[in-house]
Each structure stands twice: as structure tokens, then as C-alpha cells.
């Protein structure tokens, strides 16, 4: 099964990684994060809001994750819909950890881009009792290792013997991301990639390196998430 991408709101709102051949991993699990937050069908539970009572608070802030195009795109859709209903909406960018912290602190009222059950599992375990799950809007996202299209590697396993082609480096995102943990604990040992320097930074930093390397005609391997604009 694939991981889901959904929306989380401020409320009074361990999975394991299993490989799918050498093309990437899907996310499955039986713990609370998976069953409560990630097991859903896009659009399920949607309701007509035209008859609902208007909220008294009209100035709201929606959070989006820096470097995640789909995060800003879905936040923009929500902004457009809410402003038609008379709200004044601001979209504010965060890295994932500060974004979840800002949600539970009340600095923002909505995140549209929770990746579960792996990538954001630690944040949901930490803050879940203070958030509300508003459902998911995508259910076929994948955690992957990506390379530039014109490079030689065609499977994750190829990187075991082709590390020199990629400066023996695998670029990652935030240290606290479930994707980072899955890379260290699952992907690297499974595919024998201990010869690669797993460089942990942030999503914006990884994207900057991706742009720098490809612009210079250099091959690059990076941890990625299929379903995001960065792919």
C-alpha cells in the first residue's frame, strides 16, 4: 500500500518501510499512526459546507512546507476557497518540524500536506492529540531514491557499485523526517549503500544541491518522495 497525503488542523488532530523491488518503497504499518491518520480514501467524508454556520474568526494562517511545491499548491487552493467565503487567509512557509509545532501552538490553523504513515510519523506521535485529521487527498505517494534521468543508475541497487558516479553521496532532507529515518534504518542497509555519504540537511538545501548539480551537468542521487513537485 502507498502512503497518503492529507490535511491536519488544530484540534482540541511506527510504521515499517517495505521495499517494492528496487524502484522504491511503499509505506505500511499497523500502529496507531497508520490506522488513525493514514488509512483513508481521498475525498471520503467530504461534506457540503454551504449550510454550515460561519466561523467567527475570519483571519487565518495556513502552513505550507518549504521546498514542497504541492504543499503551497494545496494551501493556495484552500486560500482561494476560504476567501470566497469571506476569510482573510495568509500562507506561511515552514520546515516540517516548526510547521507542526506552529499548528499546535495556534500560530497556524491548517496544514494540507501531512505525509503518513512514515515521513511525518514522529510529529503526529508527538502532537496527534492536539490535531484533527481532516482526511487525505492523495493515496499513491512513494518514498524513493532519485537520480537525474541521464545518469547511469536504473535501480536503487545500482548505486552500490556506481557510487563514484554520484560523488559517493546521497542527499537527504531534515534529520527529524521519517523519510530520513527510513533511509538510514531500511534503504541503506537493504541495498548495501553504506559506501555513500548520506548527507542530511533540509528540503530547501537538498533542492538547491539538486539544481546546482544538474545545472553543472553532474550526476546526483537524492532521497525523494514521488507525488511531490520536486520529482
Question: Where do the language-model regions lie?
Answer:
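Sec-dependent bacterial lipoprotein signal peptides
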Residues: 1-11
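Bacterial lipoprotein signal-peptidase II cleavage site
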Residues: 10-30, 40
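Short, well-ordered beta-strand elements
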Residues: 31, 37-40, 55-70, 87-92, ...
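Extracytoplasmic small-molecule ligand-binding "clamshell" domains
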Residues: 60-63, 68-113
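Pocket-flanking alpha-helical
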Residues: 75, 95-129, 205-213, 229-231
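Ligand-binding cleft/hinge of the Venus flytrap
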Residues: 78-85, 163-196
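A conserved helix-loop-strand patch within extracytoplasmic ligand-binding domains
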Residues: 129-176
Amino acid at each position: 500500500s502507498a502512503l497518503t497525503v492529507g490535511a491536519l488542523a488544530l484540534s482540541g488532530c511506527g510504521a515499517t518501510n517495505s521495499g517494492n523491488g528496487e524502484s522504491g518503497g511503499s509505506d505500511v504499518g499497523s500502529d496507531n499512526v497508520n490506522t488513525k491518520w493514514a488509512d483513508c480514501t481521498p475525498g471520503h467524508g467530504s461534506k457540503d459546507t454551504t449550510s454550515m454556520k460561519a466561523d467567527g474568526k475570519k483571519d487565518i494562517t495556513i502552513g505550507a512546507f518549504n521546498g514542497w511545491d504541492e504543499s503551497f499548491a494545496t494551501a493556495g487552493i484552500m486560500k482561494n476557497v476560504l476567501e470566497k467565503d469571506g476569510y482573510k487567509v495568509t500562507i506561511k512557509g515552514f520546515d516540517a518540524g516548526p510547521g507542526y509545532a506552529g499548528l499546535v501552538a495556534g500560530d497556524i490553523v491548517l496544514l494540507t500536506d501531512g505525509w503518513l504513515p512514515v515521513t511525518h510519523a514522529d510529529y503526529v506521535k508527538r502532537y496527534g492529540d492536539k490535531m484533527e485529521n481532516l482526511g487525505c487527498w492523495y493515496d499513491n505517494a512513494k518514498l524513493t531514491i532519485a537520480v537525474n534521468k541521464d545518469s547511469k543508475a536504473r535501480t536503487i541497487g545500482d548505486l552500490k557499485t556506481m557510487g563514484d558516479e554520484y560523488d559517493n553521496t546521497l542527499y537527504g532532507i531534515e534529520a527529524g523526517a521519517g523519510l530520513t529515518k527510513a533511509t538510514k534504518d531500511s534503504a541503506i542497509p537493504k541495498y548495501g549503500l553504506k559506501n555513500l555519504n548520506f548527507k542530511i540537511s533540509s528540503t530547501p538545501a537538498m533542492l538547491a544541491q539538486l539544481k546546482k548539480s544538474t545545472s553543472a551537468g553532474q550526476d546526483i542521487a537524492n532521497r525523494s518522495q514521488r507525488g511531490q513537485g520536486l520529482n
